[in-house]
Amino acid sequence: FDALIAKEFSKVSSRGFQPYLKLVLQHYPTYTPKNYKLEIDGRIVETKALFISFANSTQFGFNTEVAPHAELNDGLLDIVVVKKPPLPLLPWTAQLLFFKNFDMSIYVNTYKARKVKVFNSKILGVNIDGEYIEIQDDLEFEVIPSSLKVIVK
C-alpha cells in the first residue's frame, strides 16, 4: 500500500501532508492486502499485510514513527508488518504513528533481525525511501554493523 501511495504521490504537483492524506483516503477502501512470505533470520513467516516496512531508524515521514524502537546502531533491522484495519479504525491506528507507539496496535507485528528475505515471484511495487520502483526478484536486506564511516572536517 505504501508503494502505491508513493507511486501516486510522485504524480501530484503539490507536496506535503494534505495531498498524501488525500491519496491514502482515496485508495484505502478498495486496496486488497497482499500475501507475503518472509525469511527473518532463518525463520519463515507467512502473512497477509497492508504493507511491510523495513526500518533502521524510527522515522517514516511527516514526523511519524513506523518503528518506534528502531535504533541506528543496534545492528538490527526492524520489520514492521501492518495488517489492514477496518476503515472505522483507520484514524485510531494512524494516530499511533504520530504518538510514537504504532507498535501498540493489534494490526501491527514487529520483528528485529540481522537478515531478511522477501520471497517474490511476480512484479512487486516497492517504496524505497519515498521512491516507487518495481521489482520481480526476491528482496534481501542485511545489516552490516559499523559499516558507515563519517568523516568530519
Where are the regions that the model predicts?
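Long C-terminal subdomains/extensions of small-metabolite kinases
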Residues: 1-153
